[in-house]
A protein has these predicted regions:
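C-terminal regulatory/effector modules of DNA-binding transcriptional regulators
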Residues: 22, 35, 188-242
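Generic structural signal for well-ordered, non-membrane alpha-helices
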Residues: 35-38, 69-72, 135, 139, ...
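N-terminal leader segment of winged-helix/HTH proteins
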Residues: 1-27, 78-79, 93-98, 102-148, ...
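Canonical helix-turn-helix DNA-binding module
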Residues: 50-82, 88-91, 170-211
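Short, cationic-aromatic polyanion-contact patches
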Residues: 32, 85-108, 172, 205-228
């Protein structure tokens, strides 16, 4: 059962990071900006009144400075339009043109297709609520990240340790790099940190000295398994009601 939870944790971690990169480089968006766009689209479709910044803050609990930065970014990339309220020039009103509505809808459809392709290893996902599932998953990872584990391990460190666990506690640096989400996670610094924390041993292969072998310290294996299982349980609790 622990092995299954570790594999699920790794699959969710990968899904989160590749989606962040997809939005960042494919659409110049963060996850928070995506969530804001979805909210603006749904509000525009379901309400006749103008959408002000104060209404967004009320409904979505944004910090005003953070919201202004996101609104400015979305406006500059033509995701949204903005204007001054006709009866109060101090108030900023957010609107969407028909083309912008279509653009956001297309983004959502493309993202759902991307998630469907990238989530084949996650059997728990109901594909009718795929985007909602992912957004809950992303939010829950941020909660876990901020709360810190009892062993003070980061999610990236747990990801690498989890890869070693499912590789029978020992593998080469070359094999690990295959799963390193190239360009997203720099494995070298993480390995050095885990060495200094006493979780793994780095050595040369006896069969071929060109290869670097990474081995988990035996006394740390149960601790690592418990940490990852605890993180997965927290993740599961946060997304189970989607």
């Amino acid at each position: 059962m622990q092995q299954q939870k570790i594999k699920r944790f790794l699959a969710h971690f990968v899904l989160d990071h590749v989606t962040i990169e997809y939005l960042k480089y494919g659409h110049q968006l963060t996850i928070e900006q995506l969530k804001l766009l979805i909210f603006i689209l749904h509000f525009t479709e379901n309400h006749k009144e103008d959408l002000s910044l104060n209404m967004i803050i009320f409904y979505k609990n944004y910090q005003k400075n953070q919201l202004l930065k996101s609104i400015t970014h979305l406006y500059e990339f033509n995701w949204i339009s903005k204007k001054r309220h006709p009866y109060d020039q101090r108030r900023l009103v957010i609107t969407l043109t028909q083309n912008q509505c279509s653009k956001i809808t297309q983004l959502i459809e493309e993202l759902e297709h991307f998630l469907e392709v990238k989530s084949t290893l996650i059997k728990e996902i109901n594909h009718s609520t795929l985007l909602s599932y992912y957004l809950k998953c992303h939010s829950q990872f941020r909660v876990i990240e901020q709360s810190c584990t009892s062993q003070h391990l980061t999610l990236k460190e747990l990801y690498l340790l989890g890869l070693l666990i499912i590789s029978d506690n020992k593998t080469t640096f070359k094999s690990i790099k295959v799963h390193a989400l190239k360009g997203i996670i720099a494995m070298g610094p993480i390995i050095k940190t885990l060495q200094s924390k006493g979780y793994l041993i780095k050595s040369r292969s006896r069969d071929d000295e060109r290869y670097i072998v990474l081995t988990l310290r035996k006394e740390k294996i149960n601790v690592i398994q418990s940490e990852i299982e605890e993180c997965y349980n927290k993740l599961e609790q946060g997304i189970q009601h989607v």
